[in-house]
From Swiss-Prot:
Keyword Disulfide bond among record annotations: no
Family label: Belongs to the plant acyltransferase family.
Gene3D superfamilies, alphabetized: Chloramphenicol acetyltransferase-like domain
Molecular-function GO terms, alphabetical: acyltransferase activity, transferring groups other than amino-acyl groups; hydroxycinnamoyltransferase activity
Organism (species): Oryza sativa subsp. japonica
Catalytic site positions: 150 (proton acceptor), 382 (proton acceptor)
Protein name in UniProt: Tryptamine benzoyltransferase 1
Length: 445
């Protein structure tokens, strides 16, 4: 791997974008999101478009979404009320060019994205909020690896931005620049007076700075003990899961139910323990009034289906899906408004809110966290020569974190990427394709 160039891509628009120079406060949803850079890696077989065309399309897309070209900063309202903001200063998107002599097929076979996206910055302040690496392979293939800061966008927004970028490359001069909804303030309008009715202190936030007893070196050592594995559930396997559930059931629900059961079995947890899954829920349509579908930013809260290990392992797929569905349904308009009101009250009191999201090196066992990319518009990441041959999984630095990714091509299916302790990973790989709903319970009771 050789990095051949590194440059900041900046945009120029006439007249300037209305947000140019603004310091946009983070919304309540932004503040609850991970304070991390999230990698995303697309692989394209030859023939692939030129790097110049990909960069020009990126420039056009960034002009429509100027927040990604800014930087995280702190407002100047005094020490007690200092808040992070997105400074729309057009400092630029970092773009790296790289070459590697091996063929792309070797990378696709290994399904490893190491070194195929920019290194994750140690600090958010001053770092480019969107960074891109274009890696050319000896066979003519191309990998587009990017990292974006989660305070700028959630998965839905990242998917929309990437689809816009691809369309700009594909359509070139015929591309019509969109006008997405960039007003983050509409996501968090509190009642007057604000009246939170749920306890959000232990769910989305905790009061005070998030502390960690681990140094960076200790966190890195913990990450080394985590095994990143990937398993593919074919379209036929997913159909069999849905048949086990019976009735209406989404791909996400049935695959999550299956993974939750099998990972819990692989962990060998005590039957009286409880296990829960942190499930990201897109709140755009659930809010009252609903937010625009093209709202760019964060608008995600979390559901927490929770079951006792004994019950989870002995329950049918139908019952586990029911528990997941019931937990997600509780993230409704009333809950969303309560969350917004809670943040308003905490700010009025001068409380420092720290997100409860896990940090690299942390272990979630006996719990899990799932991010679903199944509804993302990856098929629209066609740069003009066809959709990606694969969406590669980045390293997952948190034990118990899993990602569901749609399989490209005609076959369909779902790729599950998960980080587990080494021995749990080995056990999971041995049972992950078993459809015996109660097969593992006898070893735990």
């Amino acid at each position: 791997m050789e990095i051949t160039s590194s440059a900041m891509l900046k945009t120029t628009t006439t007249p300037p974008h209305p947000l140019a120079g603004e310091k946009v406060p983070l919304s309540a949803f932004d503040r609850a999101a991970f304070d991390v850079f999230v990698p995303l890696v697309f692989a394209y077989r030859a023939p692939a478009p030129s790097s110049e065309a990909v960069k020009e399309g990126l420039r056009v897309a960034v002009a429509a979404y100027p927040l990604v070209s800014g930087r995280i900063a702190v407002d100047g309202q005094g020490r007690r009320r200092r808040r992070r903001v997105l400074h729309v200063n057009n400092e630029g998107v970092l773009v790296l060019d790289a070459t590697v002599e091996v063929d792309l097929d070797a990378v696709l076979a290994a399904n490893v994205a190491t070194d195929l996206y920019p290194a994750l910055p140690e600090h958010s302040f001053g770092a480019a909020l969107l960074q891109v690496q274009l890696t050319r392979f000896g066979c003519g293939g191309l990998v587009v690896g990017l990292i974006g800061h989660h305070h700028v966008f959630d998965g839905h927004s990242m998917s929309t931005f990437c689809a816009t970028w691809a369309r700009a490359v594909r359509d070139s001069e015929a591309f019509i620049v969109p006008s997405p909804s960039l007003d983050r303030a509409i996501t968090g309008v509190p009642r007057s007076p604000p009246a939170p009715v749920f306890d959000h202190r232990s769910i989305e936030f905790k009061v005070g700075n998030k502390s960690s007893d681990s140094s960076g070196a200790a966190a890195a050592a913990a990450v080394e003990k985590i095994a990143n594995i990937g398993v593919r559930f074919t379209a036929k396997f997913v159909a069999e899961l849905k048949a086990r559930v019976g009735g209406r059931c989404s791909t996400f629900e049935c695959v999550l139910a299956h993974a939750w059961k099998k990972i819990t079995a692989a962990r060998g947890l005590k039957p009286e323990e409880f296990t829960r899954v942190r499930v990201a829920v897109n709140c755009r349509r659930r809010a009252n009034p609903p937010a625009p579908a093209d709202l760019f930013g964060n608008m995600v809260l979390w559901a927490f289906p929770r079951l006792q290990v004994r019950r989870l392992l002995s329950s049918s797929y139908r019952d586990v899906v029911g528990a997941i569905r019931a937990a997600v349904a509780r993230v409704d308009a009333e809950y969303i408004q309560s969350f917004v009101d809670y943040v308003e009250v905490a700010d009025a009191r001068g409380e420092e809110l720290a997100a409860t999201a896990a940090e690299p090196g942390e272990t979630l066992c006996p719990d899990l966290e799932v991010d679903s990319w199944l509804g993302f518009r990856f098929h629209e990441m066609d740069l003009g020569t066809g959709p990606p041959a694969a969406v590669l999984s980045p390293d997952l630095p948190i034990e118990g974190l899993m990602i569901l990714v749609p399989v490209g091509g005609d076959g369909g299916g779902v790729d599950l990427f998960v980080a587990l302790a080494d021995d749990h990973a080995q056990a999971f790989e041995q049972i992950c394709y078993s459809l015996e709903e109660h097969a593992m319970i006898h070893s735990h009771l």
